[in-house]
């Protein structure tokens, strides 16, 4: 197995990171030409190698968990960091799912024959080299690597220091699997050892790295957007909203809100704000607040919701602007009462991170208006925000959920990791 090269003595962090990026650039060339069969063989080899290395992976992850617990990391964030044997098996299964997906490379996006007989084809081709910066999610190391490989790209990874032991082993396993099928190990590299200074060098590796994708909290994403000279796709801080309309199926609404908030409260597609129509304030709102409280959710309530909570004997605290803007990463939610779907949309427009918003209503006029008026990557109708996920969308794993409008939006699967090239097919054609 070829391990990622160690920084030579006397080499600066910037020089070391740029050297990694150059090796990735070289490795991207054979990947660009690799057949689907070769890439799929690599992914199956990676899945097999991950399963074979389960004990090593879990042991390394235990080191990360111990450090996190000693540092006071919250239980929800520790859960995101955790890799037990069952989760390792799930990671391997996800790799095989990506192998089974269609290869986007070579897909004809559109084509035509001009009046002069010249034939045009626009084809999907790999980006080249991806740089992905992410936090404390070791499964992302594998997800990103296999999506990059399947779409014909090399990738330079920078995972959070909280998961460094896990990521080191996972990258070693992936690199060894690549070599076993004749692909260059440098198609997947890591700059974790270089810390925050390494991130700075990666962000400015223009000409070597073709696309940067940050995955993590607002501070990380904004640093990448602010400092990068490499093109960036901004991914999702998830301040997701659920609006419960007067026409909603109320039993269904309680279940959806609970799922959106409590099933995995630390992830970016968890709901952070629920807005309830004022016609439901007297009867439904106390029921919803009680259900949230019984699920362990801390309530940040506007004046109407606060009064309803106190009348029902439930603890709640006054909501602040910081709460409306927050991605809580835990069992907390902001609650507000609005007079119409228009008011709900106005609230969302002010506070959203443009990730995912849901409307719960049976009135089609309400759902149609909400879908047309809300400007977010994903809009859900009578469904949980938790469905915003590459796997749930049938895209396989995802590199991230883009909340910007160029070049991709929403969950980023294989197609979103390609660009296009035009082929102009002639027979001695010259322009007159």
Swiss-Prot record:
Q: Which UniProt keyword terms apply here?
A: Amino-acid biosynthesis, Cytoplasm, NADP, Oxidoreductase, Proline biosynthesis
Q: Where does the protein end up?
A: Cytoplasm
Q: Could you confirm whether the keyword Ion transport appears in this record? A: no
Pathway assignment reads: Amino-acid biosynthesis; L-proline biosynthesis; L-glutamate 5-semialdehyde from L-glutamate: step 2/2
**Keyword match Coiled coil:** no
Where is the major localization of this protein? cytoplasm
| GO CC terms in record | cytoplasm
Give, as one word, the top-level EC class: oxidoreductase
Q: Quote the EC number.
A: 1.2.1.41
Q: Which CDD domains match?
A: ALDH_F18-19_ProA-GPR (cd07079)
Q: Name one GO molecular function term.
A: glutamate-5-semialdehyde dehydrogenase activity
GO BP annotations listed: L-proline biosynthetic process
Q: Which reaction does it catalyse?
A: L-glutamate 5-semialdehyde + phosphate + NADP(+) = L-glutamyl 5-phosphate + NADPH + H(+)
A Pfam family: Aldedh
Q: Superkingdom of the source? A: Bacteria
Q: Could you tell me what this protein does?
A: Catalyzes the NADPH-dependent reduction of L-glutamate 5-phosphate into L-glutamate 5-semialdehyde and phosphate. The product spontaneously undergoes cyclization to form 1-pyrroline-5-carboxylate.
Similarity-based family: Belongs to the gamma-glutamyl phosphate reductase family.
Checking NCBIfam families in the record gives:
PRK00197.1, proA
Q: Give the protein's recorded name.
A: Gamma-glutamyl phosphate reductase
* Organism for this UniProt entry: Kineococcus radiotolerans (strain ATCC BAA-149 / DSM 14245 / SRS30216)
Q: What gene is behind this protein?
A: proA
């Amino acid at each position: 197995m070829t391990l990622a090269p160690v920084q030579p003595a006397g080499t600066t962090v910037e020089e070391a990171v740029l050297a990694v990026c150059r090796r990735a650039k070289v490795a991207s060339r054979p990947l660009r030409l690799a057949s689907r069969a070769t890439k799929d063989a690599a992914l199956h080899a990676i899945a097999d190698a991950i399963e074979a290395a389960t004990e090593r992976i879990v042991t390394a992850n235990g080191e990360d968990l111990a450090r996190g617990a000693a540092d006071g990391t919250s239980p929800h964030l520790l859960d995101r960091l955790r890799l037990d044997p069952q989760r390792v098996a799930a990671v391997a299964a996800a790799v095989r799912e990506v192998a089974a997906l269609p290869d986007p490379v070579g897909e004809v996006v559109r084509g035509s024959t001009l009046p002069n007989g010249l034939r045009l084809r626009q084809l999907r081709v790999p980006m080249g080299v991806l740089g992905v910066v992410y936090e404390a999610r070791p499964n992302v190391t594998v997800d990103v690597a296999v999506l990059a490989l399947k779409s014909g790209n090399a990738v330079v990874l920078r995972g959070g220091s909280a998961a460094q032991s896990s990521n080191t082993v996972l990258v070693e396993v992936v690199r060894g699997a690549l070599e076993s099928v004749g692909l260059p190990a440098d198609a997947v590299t890591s700059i974790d050892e270089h810390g925050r200074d390494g991130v700075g060098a990666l962000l400015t590796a223009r000409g070597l790295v073709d696309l940067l994708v940050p995955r993590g909290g607002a501070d990380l994403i904004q640093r990448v957007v602010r400092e990068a000279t490499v093109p960036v796709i901004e991914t999702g801080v998830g301040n997701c909203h659920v609006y419960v309309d007067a026409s909603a199926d109320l039993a269904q609404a309680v279940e959806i809100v609970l799922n959106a908030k409590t099933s995995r409260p630390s992830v970016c597609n968890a709901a952070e704000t629920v807005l309830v129509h004022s016609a439901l304030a007297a009867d439904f709102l106390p029921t919803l607040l009680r259900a949230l409280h019984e699920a362990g959710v801390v309530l940040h309530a506007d004046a109407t919701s606060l009064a309803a909570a106190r009348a029902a004997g439930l603890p709640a605290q006054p909501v602040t602007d910081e709460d409306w803007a927050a991605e809580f990463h835990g069992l907390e939610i902001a609650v507000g009462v609005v007079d119409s779907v228009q008011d709900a949309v106005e609230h969302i427009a002010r506070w959203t991170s443009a990730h995912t918003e849901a409307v719960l209503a049976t009135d089609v006029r309400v759902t149609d208006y909400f879908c047309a008026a809300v400007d977010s990557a994903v809009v859900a109708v009578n469904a949980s925000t938790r469905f915003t996920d590459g796997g749930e969308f049938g895209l396989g794993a995802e590199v991230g959920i883009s909340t910007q409008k160029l070049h991709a939006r929403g969950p980023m699967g294989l197609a979103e990791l390609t660009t296009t090239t035009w082929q102009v097919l002639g027979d001695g054609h010259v322009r007159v």
